[in-house]
C-alpha cells in the first residue's frame, strides 16, 4: 500500500503539465492540505478502517455525538443498508465507517473513485465512478462496483450508500441539501430487499467550498482535504433513524417514489432536540 494518498507521480500522470515541476506540485499540495492528508495516512495506514477513521476525529480534536445509536446495537446478524445525506464529501464517509464499522467490521460503503485513493480505507470501500457515462473504462469500474455491492449484501454483509452520489449543494431556498437521490442507487436497494437504516449528518462544509461547487465541481473536489483539516475542535452530530423494513418500502413501486421516501426519512432526522 502506498504511504501517500496522492503524490507527484499521480499528479503528473493525471496532468502532464506538471511533468518536471515537482516543487510546484509540492507547493500546491501544501496549499490544498494534501500534505497533511498524506502525513496522516502514512502514520495511520496500518490501522483497520474504523480505527483509522476514528483516529482522524481524535487528531482533529473533534467530538462525535450520535443520537439513537442503540438502533445499531439492536440490529441482528445479517445484511442491512444505510442511507445518508452527504454534506461533507469525505468526513461523513469516514464517520460512517467509524460508527457502523465498530458495530459490524464487515461494513462497506459505496464511494466515488476519488475517495478510493485513501488506501487504508479501500477494504471498507466499494468504488464507482461518477463520470462513468463519459468513458467505457469508467463504466466498467462502476459496473464492477455495483456487482460487488450486490454480492456483498447477498452474502449477508451490511452496506452504506450516499444515494445523492455527490456532495450536498446550495438550493434555491439557500439551504445546503442533497440533490435528488439517484434512481440507479435506489434500484439496487429495491432489488436487495433488506432492512434500511437512515443516518443523517448535521452541518456542512465551509461556504467557500459551497461557492466553489457552484462554479465547477472539480474546484470543490480540490478543496476537500482543506475541508477535513479545518474542522478542528468541532462537534459532529449524527442522527440514526429507526429501521425501515422491506415490507414498508415495498409500497413504493418506482425508484423515484422510494428515493423520495428514503430521503425524507433521512432528512426528518435533521431536527436536533
What function would you assign to each model-found segment?
Residues 85, 131-140, 171-176:
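Flexible, glycine/proline-enriched loop segments at strand-loop-helix junctions
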Residues 86-90, 167-168:
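Gly/Ser/Thr-rich loops at beta-strand to alpha-helix junctions
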Residues 1-86, 93-95, 102-106, 122:
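Membrane-anchoring hydrophobic helices of lipid-metabolizing enzymes
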Residues 2-9, 142-273:
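Non-catalytic C-terminal accessory region of glycerolipid acyltransferases
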Residues 107-142, 146-147:
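Conserved nucleotide-cofactor-binding alpha/beta core module
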Residues 91-98, 184-187:
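Short amphipathic alpha-helical face segments that pack within enzyme cores
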Residues 81-83, 127, 160-162:
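Structural motif
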Residues 98-101, 177-179:
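Glycine-rich, phosphate-binding/catalytic loops in enzymes
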Amino acid at each position: 500500500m502506498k504511504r501517500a494518498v496522492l503524490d507527484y507521480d499521480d499528479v503528473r500522470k493525471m496532468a502532464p503539465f506538471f511533468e518536471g515541476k515537482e516543487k510546484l506540485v509540492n507547493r500546491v499540495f501544501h496549499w490544498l492540505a494534501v500534505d497533511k492528508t498524506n502525513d496522516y495516512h502514512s502514520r495511520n495506514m496500518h490501522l483497520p478502517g474504523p480505527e483509522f477513521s476514528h483516529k482522524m476525529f481524535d487528531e482533529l480534536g473533534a467530538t462525535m455525538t450520535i443520537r439513537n445509536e442503540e438502533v445499531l446495537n439492536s440490529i441482528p446478524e445479517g445484511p442491512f443498508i444505510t442511507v445518508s445525506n452527504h454534506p461533507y464529501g469525505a468526513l461523513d464517509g469516514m464517520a460512517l465507517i467509524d460508527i457502523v464499522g465498530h458495530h459490524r467490521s464487515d461494513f462497506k460503503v459505496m464511494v466515488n473513485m476519488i475517495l478510493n485513493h485513501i488506501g487504508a480505507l479501500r477494504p471498507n470501500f466499494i468504488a464507482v465512478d461518477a463520470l462513468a457515462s463519459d468513458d467505457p473504462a469508467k463504466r466498467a469500474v462502476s459496473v464492477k462496483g455495483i456487482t460487488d455491492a450486490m454480492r456483498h449484501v447477498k452474502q449477508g454483509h451490511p452496506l452504506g450508500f450516499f444515494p445523492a452520489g455527490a456532495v450536498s449543494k446550495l438550493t434555491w431556498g439557500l439551504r445546503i441539501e442533497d440533490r435528488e437521490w439517484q434512481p440507479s442507487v435506489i434500484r439496487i436497494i429495491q432489488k436487495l430487499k433488506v432492512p434500511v437504516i437512515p443516518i443523517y449528518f448535521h452541518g456542512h462544509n465551509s461556504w467557500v467550498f459551497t461557492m466553489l461547487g457552484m462554479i465547477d465541481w472539480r474546484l470543490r473536489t480540490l478543496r476537500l482535504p482543506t475541508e477535513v483539516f479545518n474542522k478542528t475542535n468541532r462537534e459532529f452530530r449524527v442522527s440514526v433513524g429507526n429501521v425501515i423494513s422491506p415490507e414498508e418500502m415495498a409500497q413504493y413501486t418506482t425508484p423515484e417514489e422510494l428515493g423520495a421516501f428514503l430521503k425524507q426519512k433521512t432528512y426528518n432526522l435533521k431536527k436536533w432536540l
